[in-house]
Amino acid sequence: MPGIRRWSVLSLGLALPTAFFVLGPLGFLLWMGATQEGADFLERARDLELPRVVGQVALLATLTTAWAAALGVPLAWLTVRTDLPGRRLIHWLAPLPLAIPPYIGALVYQILLAPGGVLPNFLGVTSLPLNLYGVGGAAWVLGLFMSPYLYLLVSGALERTNPALEEVARGAGLGPRQVLRRVTLPLLRPALLAGGLVVFLYSWADFGVVSLLRVRTLTTIIYDYIQGTADWALPSALSILLTAITILVLLLQLRVLGRAGYTQIVGAVKPAPLVSLGAWRWPAFAYVGGMVTLTLLLPLGVLGYQASRLPAPAAFVLIQWPYFLNSLWTAVSGASLALLIALGVAWSEGRGRAWRVSGLLQVGYAIPGTVLGLGMAGFLHAALPGIYATSLALIVTYFVLYVTPACQSVKAALAQLHPSLEEAARSLGRGPLAAFWAVTLPLIKPGLLGGWILVFVLSMRELAATLIVRPPGFDTIPVRIWIYAMDVGPEPRAATLALILVLTIALPWAMMLSLRSRGIPPSG
């Protein structure tokens, strides 16, 4: 009983401040939205053409999801299940474009394809027939740079799928296409739905790409409105609408997954035999190389080229140095706070009967950045004016947005350790914290590092919430990129800062991928 009480006290101590910062912003938005009179809201909704905007965002999210799946799923199958040349290197390179935020991808393709861009100038024309600005261009960019999410989830599912099931199907006389359609794809359905949901919701709530490519969405309306007026009732009501639609999509996914079972009753899973591509081996490699070029090599090359056109680059970087330090300070602090809370939550929930705080943490992760930024700014202004308009507000915002991935990483690491390891240490006279420090912590360090890196990367690249919550004069690198790109266009200053941000994010992200890539054997 004392042990149970100890876990309950710990989890309650984590639950109360977490609930304060997670539910407080939502409560503020609900309260402000309730002050918006119904008739007035309907009139403003007509002025804003709200039904058309919602339909446009739904189209954007659908096109983005389909495009990302068309790119990421074949890439995962080729890398994991075929004798593709260099598959181990590709397995490491394919997720690396996640270090490039989609809004930087939009900047890259503006530099490359927009009127007056690199390609039109090279061809000697004013503009290209294709139009980068609009729903089509935004879907192209978002799908391209979100496809690694599909790749990660589907490749992981392919690695875990028992190949014996496919062997039985082949033994029953089914051809390769029939096995893929009737066995492999149904087993991949949870991963496909999960990845598709991530892409759909990201596109639905995106701000950076759609603002740069001039697509009118709920997020751009919310941001533009709060910049031009002190009345937050309408943007709060729109934020509630955006969040409600997000929750409906999440519930729909749970309903779809809940209707079917996905249990594989197997023992140890042996590696699947590689499918021989035969004459298609090198064409498949060319396809994969094209993917890596479009999502990684070309963006880096374009940013490097545009940055090289900057006069006095050293002086410019020196001037921008404070913004880099702002980004680093808030991202490191936000990641450290998130990991600390995640460790306490995962440990208390995994080692005793405790309050289930992790479910509360997921609320913040499901809220779009624009919505949380608006709610957090208003909530802190009303409840904690000492934190409002300081860098601490950004740190708390990053914690609420991204503590869930950290918690999942720590939980996964703890799940691999049996509680008897700590119990053995305690039987030798060590207390709970001493046993954790001496036994558990050294064994879960990789999981802790992975969770910290993930939150750091996400915080370092966050744009929408940062724009709204940041104190006056406290800009970060993403904010400066956006300001330069919106005010002047895809010019060298924006490209230089974008290159700095990508390289800063890529280093820790590559460390994670290096550990992960060891699970893929080289092609034979």
Regions found by a protein language model. Name each.
Residues 111, 204-230, 463-491, 524:
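Glycine-rich helix-loop "coupling/hinge" segments at transmembrane-helix boundaries
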Residues 118-128, 214-216, 313, 473:
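Membrane-interfacial helical/loop segments at transmembrane boundaries in membrane proteins
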Residues 256-288:
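Flexible interhelical linker loops that connect adjacent transmembrane helices
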Residues 2-7, 173, 270-276:
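Cytosolic juxtamembrane amphipathic/interface segments immediately preceding
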Residues 165, 262-274, 421, 515-524:
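Short cytosolic juxtamembrane segments of multi-pass membrane proteins
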